[in-house]
Amino acid sequence: MMKRSSRLRRAACACAVITAVVLGVCSPAAAASPATAGAYCVMDAQTGEVICQKNAYTRMEMASTTKVMTALVALENAPLSLTVRITRAEAGTEGSSMYLRAGDVYTLEDLLLGMTLVSGNDAALAVARTVAGSEASFVRLMNEKAQEIGMCDTHFDNPHGLHSQQHYTSAYDLALLCGYAMQNAEFCRIVSCKSAGIKELTSGETRVMVNKNRFIYAFEGADGIKI
């Protein structure tokens, strides 16, 4: 297992358990306000130095921030032009949704947009199955990537973040992951979108989806990622 001191990287994230990620350093105004999150970790963008933290190494549920890894693994293993046909099981996924319908066909890029902008659990499952052949195989890739990055307090059990006792991370590990992911140009472009047109290829129907991450509207320089 890697020592925590060696896990510091060129990352830049302010992370909480139900996490808002903002690249850069805390402003004086933000530093003066008491943090109410149960856990957070703020890293310097260039040095990987932990500027401030609270319970940064405590294992907690990661919820929809799971999709940061889902998007990263998909981008590293498949082209954005890959077409995905939605199954009945995926269309009925519980929780936050793109409201996909069985038989619909989308590009991987549009599913990644829906997954990050509106946190579609249905899209996450469809992406996982198509990229790796099965959800289990995709989750294996997620855990392998976590080990590569140095996420020592993280284990993935699904690609969407619904509750599982075997699905957890820490604020520090999320900071590592987000800093790593933002080095991927396509990932950075997708998560920083304020809105996007999502096209179903069979019918040609296009829906506009708006990013639910209020940080990108409220703070100059915020690059998005997940809340």
Model-derived regions, located:
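A short, well-structured edge-of-sheet supersecondary motif
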Residues: 30-53
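Penicillin-recognizing serine hydrolase domain
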Residues: 35, 134-227
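Active-site SXXK
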Residues: 48, 61-85, 174
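Short, well-structured active-site flanking segments
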Residues: 76-90, 185-194
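Soluble non-cytosolic domains of exported or imported proteins
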Residues: 59-68, 102-109, 117-121, 132-140, ...
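C-terminal segment of classical bacterial N-terminal signal peptides
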Residues: 21-29
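Bacterial N-terminal signal peptides that target proteins for export
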Residues: 2-15
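Conserved catalytic neighborhood of penicillin-recognizing serine enzymes
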Residues: 94-126, 206-227
